[in-house]
Amino acid sequence: MSSDMRVHSWSCSYYLDLEKQWVSGKLTLTPHSLKFIVEKTEEVLVGLPLSSIIEIRKESSLFIFGAITVLEKGQTKHWFSSLQPSRNVVFNVIEHFWRELLLSQPGTAANIPSHVTRGQELIGLMANSQKRMEDTAKDLQQQSEQLDSVLKGLEKMESDLDVADRLLTELETPSWWPFGSKFWKMPAEENLKEGVSSTCEPFGKEGVVITVPAIISERAESHSKLGKLTVLVSALEIYDSCSLLLHRFEKEDVDDIKVHSPYEVSIRQRFIGKPDVAYQLISAKMPEVIPILEVQFSSKIELLEDALVLRNKVFASSAERHAASRPKGCTPHRELPTGGQEGEQLQLQKNLPLFSEGEAQELTQILSKMKGLALDTEAELERQDAALDGITVAVDRATLNVDKQNRRMRKLM
């Protein structure tokens, strides 16, 4: 696929350091570069390969707040502001493609200048990942406190329902009955908890076809979040960054899937009398998912505009595989580089060390912290899953109790 394929474009302003002014235009992201095009002249004012970017940050300007800064080789810093629809949306998409490129193409680090080694870049990447995991752990802690408060509220509700049950039993007991308040015994009451628990059994495990990280937005494009898309044999599942299920599309419930580009798809489920459920997903790994969606949802998927290039890529790759499978005698002659710039670059890449001992120790410390955070997060998620199961059972039991007591009160009236 061509590296000039547009992933997304956003309206924004770029700061010209020499002229000390902001210029309006469009920020365009491709799979391997970031470009800023001036609105009036349509001139490409800035063109940055993603492999040359060292750092992407969210910062604030003294004059225009809410900016994104991009630091490239040579310590050149670029400012982008007035981002539409929002700064967070643009930042999430750009950072996602930048990270995926760094992880999938480690050889691009050979061009890093001498003052920024590959080890330093890897440390920065791992430090950002550690910060994200720490933020996720804080969010999980807050979520755990909310679940605990919900459980306490349900326990209080259950005790109140027990009091109401005793009062109703007193009211239902005739004054001439000499054996206390135990007059009628409700047979349904004995098997109440058993019936609720039997209806709350979890779904069986399904075969996972593929799972990819993605930027997720629901209806409003101005709000997006990090997450992942999981393609199952009989469904599509969308999760947030904490691996909590946002929505599950059963295969028969999906009404249409639109492929806006090889990196962007939208999934919709229509309803009558209430808003449709629609999600828009952007991912650097989406070209691996679209062929699977075409097979599973052949009658519901629609390729739009630039997405047609994806099929051309499939045909081209199949032709390349066919050519590679020819016998050696039929393989066309191909000259190998015999020196020059390519040979020097390969030799430089071999001689350049990956990282020093100090950087290796720092990476080891970061990885050990991330391992501990991952284990704590996994344990917390399991605890919250159990808490959610308990909440589900308690809510169903409370609902049945309320319905039963409402019927008893109607009989007394």
Curated annotation (Swiss-Prot):
User: Which tissues and organs express this gene's product?
Assistant: Ubiquitously expressed with the most abundant expression in the brain. In brain, most highly expressed in the glomerular layer of the olfactory bulb, the cortex, striatum, hippocampus, and colliculi (at protein level).
Q: What is one process in the GO biological process aspect for this record? A: long-term synaptic potentiation
Report the subcellular localization. Answer: Endomembrane system; Cytoplasm, Perinuclear region
Concerning InterPro entries, the annotation shows: PH-like_dom_sf, T_SNARE_dom
> A cellular component term (GO) from this record?
glutamatergic synapse
Q: Which UniProt keywords apply?
A: Coiled coil, Cytoplasm, Membrane, Repeat
Per the record, which residues fall in region Disordered? 321-342
Positions of the t-SNARE coiled-coil homology domain: 109-171, 350-412
- Cross-referenced CDD domains: SNARE_SNAP47N
Q: What the protein does? A: May play a role in intracellular membrane fusion.
Q: Outline the subunit composition.
A: Associates with the BLOC-1 complex. Interacts with BLOC1S6. Forms a complex containing SNAP47, VAMP2 and STX1A.
* Family note: Belongs to the SVAP1 family.
Name the record gives this protein: Synaptosomal-associated protein 47
The organism encoding this protein is: Mus musculus
